[in-house]
Amino acid sequence: MKKQRRFQGQDIHGMLLLDKPVGISSNGALQRVKQIYQARKAGHTGSLDPLANGLLPICLGEATKLSGFLLEADKRYQVMCRLGVVTTTGDADGEVLETHPVNELDRDEVAKFLSGFSGPQEQVPPMYSAIKHQGQRLYKLARQGIEVERKSRQVTIHTIKLTELVNNELGFEVFCSKGTYIRTLAEDIGRALGCGAHVIALRRTQVGSFGASDMISLEELEMLAETNVEALGNLLLPVGQILADWPAVNLIADLAYYLRQGQSVRVPQAPSEGWVRLIECGKGFFGVGRITEDGRIAPRRLIFSQSG
């Protein structure tokens, strides 16, 4: 008889650092994790294309209240491009639009050339993206052969460095701001080289302060679900650790009470601006707040349970 999972009927709270495999959508991976944990509520913190793999933080239960903050986080990718070929989608899943000869490239010159892409820049989102235009996803319009004008967005490439250059394939690692489309970056690089390019492999290795070292694959997760259910719970990061790099404000019980009631409070020696984690002395993390113009802390996301 199959062992009943201890999560059944319980509220599960925490974040899983999933290593999403190639060939599955981010939502598909999310639904499988949600089923394994039998979670009532789940959400991811920034989608990866089916062609891409790597870090996909998945929030369960109360952790979903904080998922939007990781959407805003910087991200790191390992990218492999094929030079000389332009596709409809900017990656290997698309149809070939153009082919061009690739001139012999010097590694040192290409490394220097790539560094020129660092810094703030305007980027036009690709048609094959989930951005909406008049209520419709752009990729749905693209599949109908419809192209619409898209507004450029400012993104920042913090660092970009060459990792490989062989047989018309160019690899690089990029650390960038939210909203950066790697397919568009690859196309821009190919265009600047005069030969075109598209992404053939993409791996995300960092989201905010979370790196690849603590990821677990979907295959390993499903195996644990059958053989070691207790270990599943241990894989979840507590809700209070999701924004651990934020400044914390320690609060006495009275001030914590008022914040839980939705009231702003004044706390001595609190930061002068920005977001803060709310910590009640003796009880721990219970949400996040923001410093108002008059120096008070206003509650923004309150957490009512951290484990299930």
Curated annotation (Swiss-Prot):
Entry keyword annotation includes Flavoprotein: no
InterPro entries with a match to the protein in the record: PsdUridine_synth_cat_dom_sf, PsdUridine_synth_N, PUA-like_sf, PUA_sf, tRNA_psdUridine_synth_TruB, tRNA_sdUridine_synth_fam1_C, TruB_C
EC number in record: 5.4.99.25
One Gene Ontology MF term: RNA binding
Enzymatic class: isomerase
A Pfam family the protein falls into: TruB_C_2
TM regions (residue ranges): none
Catalytic activity of the protein: uridine(55) in tRNA = pseudouridine(55) in tRNA
Keywords: Isomerase, tRNA processing
Active site residues of this protein: 49 (nucleophile)
Classification via SUPFAM superfamilies: Pseudouridine synthase, PUA domain-like
Family: Belongs to the pseudouridine synthase TruB family. Type 1 subfamily.
HAMAP family: TruB_bact (MF_01080)
Biological role stated in the UniProt entry: Responsible for synthesis of pseudouridine from uracil-55 in the psi GC loop of transfer RNAs.
Protein's name according to its UniProt entry: tRNA pseudouridine synthase B
Organism from which the protein derives: Nitrosococcus oceani (strain ATCC 19707 / BCRC 17464 / JCM 30415 / NCIMB 11848 / C-107)
